[in-house]
C-alpha cells in the first residue's frame, strides 16, 4: 500500500465553470472522487490539496516527505510556467512525480509551452481533460508497482 498526493494548482477550484471549452465541465470534486475510487480499488491512500497560493503547495510538498508520501501527481496550472520555487521543492524532497494538465499546453499560447517541471518529472500527461488525472494516476500505479515502496511499521 502506497500513499499518493495529488496537488492542484491555481484556479483549478473553478473547474466546471472556468472556460469549459478548454477545461471541461467536471468540477474538481468530481475529479477527486474518481481518483479516490481508483486508489481505493488498488488499496492505496490518496491525499489532495488545491491551492491558489504557491507557498501552500510548497509547504505541502515538504510535509509529504516527512509523511512518507510515495508519489505525487501535480497539476501546477499557471505555476508550470513561472515557479522555480515549486520546482525546487519537488526536486528537494526527491519524491517521484507526474506533471498533469487538463489541456494540451503545446497547442495553446506560446508562453504555456515551457514547463519548469517536466525535465525532473517521471512523465507528463496533458490534453485529455479530466482523464489526464486518471492517466497520471495510472502512471503512478505503474511506477509504484515497479518500485515497491517500503512498508511503514507503526
From Swiss-Prot:
Its EC number is 4.2.1.10. Catalyzes a trans-dehydration via an enolate intermediate. One of its GO terms (biological process) is amino acid biosynthetic process. GO terms for molecular function: 3-dehydroquinate dehydratase activity. The record marks 18 as: Transition state stabilizer. Keywords: Amino-acid biosynthesis, Aromatic amino acid biosynthesis, Lyase. It catalyses: 3-dehydroquinate = 3-dehydroshikimate + H2O. It comes from Teredinibacter turnerae (strain ATCC 39867 / T7901). It comes from the Bacteria. Pathway: Metabolic intermediate biosynthesis; chorismate biosynthesis; chorismate from D-erythrose 4-phosphate and phosphoenolpyruvate: step 3/7. The gene is aroQ. It is an enzyme of class 4 (lyase). NCBIfam families: aroQ (TIGR01088), PRK05395.1-1 (NF003804), PRK05395.1-2 (NF003805), PRK05395.1-3 (NF003806), PRK05395.1-4 (NF003807). This is 3-dehydroquinate dehydratase. Pfam families: DHquinase_II. Substrate binds at residues 75, 81, 88, 102-103, 112. The active site is at 23 (proton acceptor), 101 (proton donor). Belongs to the type-II 3-dehydroquinase family. Homododecamer. Gene3D superfamilies: Dehydroquinase, class II. InterPro entries: DHquinase_II, DHquinase_II_CS, DHquinase_II_sf.
